[in-house]
UniProtKB/Swiss-Prot annotation:
InterPro entries hit by this protein: IQ_motif_EF-hand-BS (IPR000048), Kinesin_motor_dom_sf (IPR036961), Myosin_head_motor_dom-like (IPR001609), Myosin_N (IPR004009), MYSc_Myo8 (IPR036022), P-loop_NTPase (IPR027417)
Transmembrane segments: none
Ranges for domain IQ: 832-861, 855-884, 891-920
Basic residues bias: start-end ranges: 918-933
Protein name as it appears in the record: Myosin-4
Function: Myosin heavy chain that is required for the cell cycle-regulated transport of various organelles and proteins for their segregation. Functions by binding with its tail domain to receptor proteins on organelles and exerting force with its N-terminal motor domain against actin filaments, thereby transporting its cargo along polarized actin cables.
Keyword Repeat attached: yes
Quaternary structure and interacting proteins, as annotated: Homodimer.
Highest classification ranks of the organism: Eukaryota, Viridiplantae, Streptophyta, Embryophyta, Tracheophyta
Domain Myosin motor: 164-830
Amino acid sequence: MMKSSVKEILESLRLLDSSERSSSLPSPSTFRAPMPLIRQSLPAKFRNAISLESKTIEKEDKDWSTEQITQSAEKEKTGNEVVKISTAQMSRAKNSHDPEWINSAEYFVREKLCVWCRVAANGQWHLGKIHSTSSSDDVCVMLSANDDVRTMEEIFPANPEILEGVEDLTQLSYLNEPSLLYNLRVRYSQDLIYSKAGPVLIAVNPFKNVQIYGEEFLSAYQKNALDAPHVYAVADAAYDDMMREEKNQSIIISGESGAGKTETAKYAMQYLEALGGGSFGVENEILKTNCILEAFGNAKTSRNDNSSRFGKLMEIHFSAKGKICGAKLETFSLDQSRVAQLCNGERCYHIFYQLCAGASPILKERLKIKAASEYNYLNQSNCLTIDRTDDAQKFHKLMEAFNIVQIPQEYQERTFALLAAVLWLGNVSFEVIDNENHVEVVADEAVTNVAMLMGCNSKKLMVVLSTCKLQAGRDCIAKRLTLRQATDMRDSLAKIIYASLFNWLVEQINISLEVGNSRTGRSISILDIYGFESFKDNSFEQFCINYANERLQQHFNRHLFKLEQEEYEGDGIDWTKVEFIDNQECLNLIEKKPIGLVSLLNEESNFPKATDTTFANKLKQHLNANSCFKGERGRGFRIKHYAGEVLYNTNGFLEKNRDPLHVDLIQLLSLCKCQLLNLFSTKMHHDFLKPATFSDSMNQSVIAKFKGQLFKLMNKLEDTTPHFIRCIKPNSNQLPGLYEENHVLQQLRCCGVLEIVRISRSGYPTRLTHQELAVRYGCLLLDTRISQDPLSTSKAILKQCNLPPEMYQVGYTKIYLRTGVISVLEERKKYVLRGILGLQKQFRGYQTREYFHNMRNAAVILQSYIRGENARRNYIVVGESAIVSTAITKELDAAIHLQYMVRKWLARKLLNSTQQKNKPRNEKKKTRRKSTKRVSEDKELLSEQFEVQPCVLADLQSRVLKVEAAIMQKEDENTALQEELQRFEERWLENETRMKSMEDTWQKHMSSMQMSLAAACKVLAPDKTASHGTDSEDTMSFGTPTKELKGSLSDVNNLSTEFDQRSVIIHEDPKSLVEVKSDSISNRKQHAEELRRLKSRFEKWKKDYKTRLRETKARVRLNGDEGRHRNWWCKKSY
């Protein structure tokens, strides 16, 4: 394989002496954690608590991030020390006279500290104290008041009490198996089922309900109010990484059967649903799919009451805003054999028991459903119920889930019908008919019900189950089956129907959860696959399950051990390799070509005469050289898996791997009336015709399909960032509160928890390329003139943050950071970005204000221009209208002036006539006035001659005041009279309106009367044949009314004319009074007197006018009535 030029350059650089290295590349960090003091027993957490006060005093003089990094550095330093201790303990087996451990033992004796020692009687670890030591490697340990002598290899140091029940196992001062077991046991006893082992979450199944879930905890973890280990925290970390890095994430849940993987997966989905719930509305559907998949894919086994008999990968997609927009479900290798064969104490799939217990009476009657004990497929294991499980209630929840996932009611009933058909197939029996053990189907209730539920002919069904067709040239021969063959044919039909139904349900779920156009490339995949299994009798199904777990363990090792350590070594940083248990040898045993177990199984399955015994012999012949394989007598063989050694029996391996698909069964399904069965048959027929070559036929084997699915799954997981959850089963009896140390220890060893903690405490979980670090945290640099070289920029960033050198290492291509450093950098970045945002906010505010002021000033100027233009236009319009109005005003003024002159002339004329009449009286008044004038002149002379007395002056002043008051009163009266005049004008307008309406009415009456008169004239025209006397009479009788009518009309016209003239006079007279402006008291009195005269004249005319109007109305009405009577008489006489 050719190496790239970059790799060659890096390899050559590694070989160069440190003095010859390029200055542009960093030298590997020389930092190594110092060896711990032998007497050191307290953890970093405890030391930090002691020095808290001093740190608080010094905090003002330190950078805040430096303090956090220093505390993290102390923790990491302790971690590295513990690694050295553990390494020393591992080496003591080779050199039992290690002086360091002897000194440590003396320290433990002197301080009376505890150690762990395994008791041979029960194999349990117990706490004891070292009582004494010898010159050899033997120590005396006191256990429960009994002394026991042990070698140095048999004891391990115990952690102080302050570290009991720590959340993260990396916080333990002494890292060994008994310390891990004890810490998990303490937490398990307190219902703290979650613990951390570096990046891995350890979940111990409590086998009971614990109060650490629900809305309160969901909200707390969303708000980062809690940081305790929890499945919610893992899901939250996956979500944050997806949104921040825009990379797909995966949550891989593993563990043995019964460890709680399915429940853990459901809680992870629940948190993601709460975190990413949105307007798309699919989050509830995603949760409800668990109910459907558990019912159809889970069953009770001897080790787990709710064991998943299939693997599933739920890929949840998110929008750019982090909201769930859809999901996709993938399933792997459903255990079909469980439909027909069960071990004692186990159950078939949950759905069958739920259907029998929870179906409504109407549904049971329609589908012929009986109790579960009536079906052979269910009662063969003598286990029909599960403790603390209500199958009827589960069935009702299943119905709700069907509705939420939008499976139509019609298809729900068809699904239940096929389930009932599978149950009744188990009750189909056969009868032997000859000595060759050939059989035929017994025509009983079971056959009838199966044919009815499938929608096929019962006779056709019986033929298919008891015979098989063989092609002999062009002829097709029907061959009878033996009892074993017929039973297998029946069971094959049941398994085909159930497996096809399961796959169809998965397709319907995917249709309901389809992402569509909302796909953004951001997803979180949750893997829940069957756990490691080892029973008394292990067959093909257990081999497939354990093979899948081996592949998952390799993925786990690859990401947590191999890739990380290879990256450390390849990038040139200082690193001490951590050993771990690698299962690659076991995978080679299974997968290696051409002599791997899978290849040999496929090869043997293609030989028609091959048997399970020949297959077992071939395995022993080719695989004995592998350390993970061990042949047994007969058909048995052993494989040393990562989780333990398992004994397999090859009985049924070949037949189950071939999984022959009978053409007769496909044809039977295609003839059924059930639409689902027709759909299943079409797909199976397509798959049956698909293989065209030998290699294709090999790929059709069950193990080949399973291997292909497994590799596809691994490739998908490799493209994601993994988050691991290891589920631990505390006891094999599934009892709450029971903690079996040996059972837990075996699982911890299989998971490599000890090695995970070691590598987590001494490793660098966060790594970024120089370019990524420079781009992401370049904003932390205050000096913008720094070199643009990413390496130099990265170093400057780390120096700017005052990070201790032991908290990071600089590699050839990446920067490696210890735990906690990235959070400090993120906090510093947030702090700087908040300042930048504040500055941007202020600047944008200034820009906005300036823009607003400019816009306001421009608007004011524009408004002024517009108002000026409008004013000019209005001035032109007003000027033109003023010219017109001035001409009209002049004409009106001339008319008013003319009227004024006429009224003035009339008033003078009236005055002259009045003066002529009153001339004698006036002369007398003149004489009296002259005498009065002489008297007044005499008084004036007297007043001039005599001084006015004060009392007289006061009297005169009071009189003046009275006169002024009288003038004011007269002015008020004048105002009142003007108001009254205005009211009279209003009344006049009303009267005028009424008169007009009355005039119209009378005009109409007159028109109708004239028409009647004209008609009467036409009717009463002079008849020359009539007598002269009659004509004379008629003429006189008609003539009089006509004259009267003409008289009435003339009266009406006179009244109308008089009314018009009078209205003009009444309207003009007050105006003339108003127009004459005079402030003298005499003129005011004259105006008031003139107004009273106008008022009295108007009242008098109004009264006379009303009288004449009534008389005229009476005459007109009388003439109208006579005309009607005359008209009637004329018509009658005519």
